[in-house]
Structures are given as C-alpha cells and as structure tokens.
Regions:
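Membrane-interfacial loop-to-transmembrane alpha-helix junctions, especially the N-terminal start
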Residues: 24-36, 79-93, 156-168, 215-225, ...
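Aromatic-anchored segments of alpha-helical transmembrane domains
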Residues: 38-45, 91-101, 170-179, 227-236, ...
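Aromatic-rich transmembrane-lumenal/periplasmic boundary elements in polytopic membrane proteins
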Residues: 269-374
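Hydrophobic alpha-helical segments
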Residues: 182, 237, 392-491
C-alpha cells in the first residue's frame, strides 16, 4: 500500500484523522507542476544561451506572472482560498520573479551582488537562481502528490456542528502570552514553535467559521475581531519583525477572500496594507534597528517611537517608498545564497554532509537535552562568510537556505531529492490538518504549514527537524483527542 492511496478523513466529518483507502477520490492535477517544469526548462535555456543578467530578468519576467496565475487558480478551487501551494507560489512570484528581474537589471548595469561581506560572480548568481527554481519545483511536486482531498460526498450534519468560541479565545490568549513571554517556554524547544502561531491560527478560524456556529451575535463578532486583531498587532510589534507585524492582518484578508459579500473589499484593503508596509512598517522597523534603544526603553516602546518617526507625506515620500521597495526586492531574492554556494562548490567541491553534522543532534527533543546546541546555522554561516570572527560573536544570522545547503553538500541530485522530501512531508502535515479544518488545533496546523512552512525554509536539516517535531506533536494530540471522544461516546 503506497502513500498515494491513503487519505486523511476530512475534519469536516468531525472525526480525528484516520488513514483510509481513497484512491477513487485522489484526482491529482499535474498541469500546474508541468507549467512549473516548463519555466525551469526556459530558465535553463536562458542560462546556457544568454548571459547572467538576461537569465535573471528574462526568467523573472515569465516566472512572476505565471506563479501569480497558478497561485490564483490553486486558491480558487480550495474551500479556504489559501493553501500551502498557493502561498508558496505567491511568495516565490516575488523571490523568483520580481526580485530576479530587479537583480538582472542591477547586473546589467555592472553592479555585483553582495552576500553579507562577500560578492557573487554574476554567472554564479544566475546558476544559483536556476538551482533554486529547481528546488521550488521539487517542493511543488511533493506538495501536490501528498495534498489532501476531501470526500466528494456532501458533508454529513456533524460537519456543521458548533465550534467552541471559548476554546478559540483560550488558544488566542495562550498564543498572545507566548508572543509576549516566549522565554517562559524556551525549555520546550521545537515543541513550543506552534505556540508562536497559535493566536494567528485561532483568529483565522474565528473569522472563517460562521458566527452562528459559535453562538455569537454580529456585534460580538465585530468587537471580538477588533480586539483579536489589535492584540495580535501589539504582540507582534514586540517581536520587531516586519513580517510578523503584517501577518497580524492575515485573518482579515483571509475573511475577505472567503466571504463573497466582502470580497469586493479585498483589493482596496490589500493596496492599503501594501502602502502601510512600505510607508510605515518597513521604515519604522528599519529605523528601530539602526537607532540604539535608550536606557530603560523596552523593545516595544523603542519600536513604537520609531513608528512615530515614520516618513510623512511630502517631497521625500516617493524616495522613501522607492528605497523600501529596493530593499524588499533585494531581501526576497533568496537564490543569492545558492549563487554564493555555486562558487564554493566550484572552488572546493561538494561537502558530502560535512556541514550537516548537526543533524546528529538536531532531531533530539530539547525536553530530553535542555543544553542542546542551537540547531540554526545562521550564526555559523555568518562566521563562515567572514562577517564575524567566531560563531559566538556573530550579531546577525545569515540564511543558507534548504536548497543552498543541499546543493553545497550533494549537488543537483541532492536538491531534487531533499526538496521533494520537504514537499512530501509538509504535504503529510497538510493532509493531517485537512483542506477545511474546523477545529482550532487543526487550523493551527494548517496555518503552520501554509505560512511559516512555505515562507521560511532555512537549512534543510532544520526544516526536516521542524517537520518531524510537528508531526509527532500533532499526531499525539489528535490521538489523545480521538481516544477522549471515543470514551465519551461509549460512556
């Protein structure tokens, strides 16, 4: 029996996930993957026949609109409109699309691309881009193969059962507590990672479930949505992360996409949030990192003061937006690490696992080893690049990326196998959550796969370790919940 013949029962049915034979329900559509593969072929042809600059801006000009269309088509057929695949394609439409165009024109102007304190040869950068595009295709294949499929039959009445408003509120409160006091949970290691997304997952489920099923009035819904969003914004401001601050608005955007009566507001609110990011959030967070906090000033108040110093409408407004857009496109070009490592491989050869030795302890839970070394290799890579004398002295974390680490160690074949494995295992987690989760913990898993899972793929070993911890954690939780429901049913 193969995994392709197994399917998790839909959470709409009100049951814990159990594996069932559902071959007749698995209708895998490979057309988007084929289109993705054709993009890779075109980029490879450009790399062989054209220069580095042409490869980047020509490939990016095709990848950007194609990925956006594929993301739209993927979301349109999904009950929640947002799926791991749609998020992955949408996100990479910038990293492998618009950012590639931006980098291509910079190279055409004779500018070398910096990577920390190092510089990358244009040809290496173009090769790294194609390798990264190959890795994205491998992830797409794995996700598409393991994606969940709902039962084609109409959901039974249990699928329209009530949803606990108190349970959603409790999980939101626990998630916000974690965001304010993450140090309280540090001893849990990877097990505590879902807590950082619990408030977002709870608020997302709140806006997606009809309020009648939660037994609340329209007024209560509106007040709760405002309080939930405001609390999430305040908690995420404390993180000092531009991405986390903007993630606070995801439940509202999600609600607009799913509810037809509100969908007309998606475009104006989306544009407003875009202007808010480039005009306020990005410059304020950037300024907070440049200006040292005063004595007695907390990270939260320091960032709030920086918000107050955000650019006002005036003569320099366009310049501020332009600078922030340039910074955004530069940061989004994650293939820069692959480009640097292409040069390392050409000079020193493949590492054959030498830089992945931390895998020997990465999969050991911190609960069993409280003093376990850090699994993230960002500080180590910063020192490797020469930006710090030693790993312990590094003040910044430089991402290797899963694709870059796999190529550095095992070449193109390692990228194909390793990234496809990441897609397969994230697809398994997606299948555990279901396509339309109706319970808070299932929604939390869905959010974990769709947002941090698809947007943040650091070192390959780190990604695999995170997937394993989430699989074990949620498998135990779902099993215990199923056993509890079974005992209640028989009592």
């Amino acid at each position: 029996m193969t995994l392709s013949k197994l399917n998790w029962d839909s959470p709409m049915a009100g049951r814990a996930p159990v594996l069932t034979i559902a071959a007749e329900q698995r209708r895998i559509h490979w057309a988007p993957v084929v289109v993705h593969g054709l993009l890779l072929c075109l980029a490879t042809v450009f790399l062989i026949s054209g220069g580095a600059a042409f490869t980047l801006y020509a490939s990016g000009s095709i990848v950007a609109p194609t990925f956006l269309v594929l993301a739209y088509l993927e979301g349109r057929k999904a009950p929640l409109r947002i799926t791991p695949i749609s998020v992955y394609l949408f996100w990479n439409s910038f990293g492998l699309g618009f950012s590639a165009i931006f980098m291509g024109f910079k190279i055409a102007q004779g500018v070398w691309i910096d990577f920390s304190v190092a510089q990358i040869l244009p040809d290496d950068l173009a090769t790294g881009y194609v390798i990264y595009l190959l890795g994205s295709l491998a992830v797409h294949i794995g996700l598409n193969y393991m994606r969940p499929f709902e039962n084609i039959k109409r959901p039974n009445p249990a699928g329209r059962s009530s949803v606990s408003f108190a349970g959603i509120a409790a999980l939101w409160a626990l998630g916000v507590t974690y965001l304010f006091r993450a140090s309280w949970f540090s001893s849990l290691g990877n097990v505590s990672r879902p807590l950082g997304w619990m408030a977002l997952g709870a608020l997302s489920l709140f806006v997606l479930v009809p309020r009648e099923r939660m037994g609340i009035s329209k007024r209560t819904f509106g007040v709760t949505l405002f309080i939930g969003t405001a609390g999430l914004i305040v908690a995420n401001i404390q993180s000092g992360s531009k991405a986390f601050i903007m993630f606070s608005f995801l439940p509202v955007i999600w609600m607009l996409l799913v509810r037809r009566d509100l969908r007309r507001w998606s475009m104006p609110i989306g544009i407003g949030l875009l202007l808010f990011y480039f005009g306020v959030v990005a410059p304020a967070v950037g300024r907070s990192r440049e200006v040292q906090a005063q004595e007695g000033e907390t990270a939260f108040t320091h960032l709030i003061d920086s918000f107050g110093a955000a650019p006002r409408v005036g003569t320099n407004m366009f310049e501020q937006f332009s600078n922030q857009l340039d910074d955004f496109l530069s940061r989004q070009f994650e293939a820069v690490s692959s480009g640097y490592l292409v040069g390392e491989v050409r000079r020193d050869g493949y590492q054959w696992g030498d830089t992945m030795s931390y895998a020997m302890y990465a999969f050991i839970p911190r609960l069993l080893w409280p003093n376990k070394p850090s699994v993230s290799r960002g500080a180590w890579f910063t020192a490797y690049l020469g930006a710090a004398a030693r790993e312990e002295e590094a003040t910044t974390s430089t991402g290797i990326s899963a694709t870059g680490e796999l190529y550095w160690n095992f070449g193109v074949l390692g990228v194909v196998i390793g990234m496809c494995g990441i897609g397969l295992f994230y697809g398994l987690l997606w299948r555990m959550a279901g396509t339309n989760p109706q319970k808070p913990l299932r929604m939390l898993l869905y959010v974990l796969v769709s947002i941090p899972g698809m947007l943040d793929m650091p070192e390959a070993v780190t990604v695999y370790g995170g997937i394993l911890s989430q699989f074990l954690l949620f498998s135990v939780i779902f099993y215990v919940m199923e056993m509890g429901r079974g005992r209640l049913a028989t009592s």
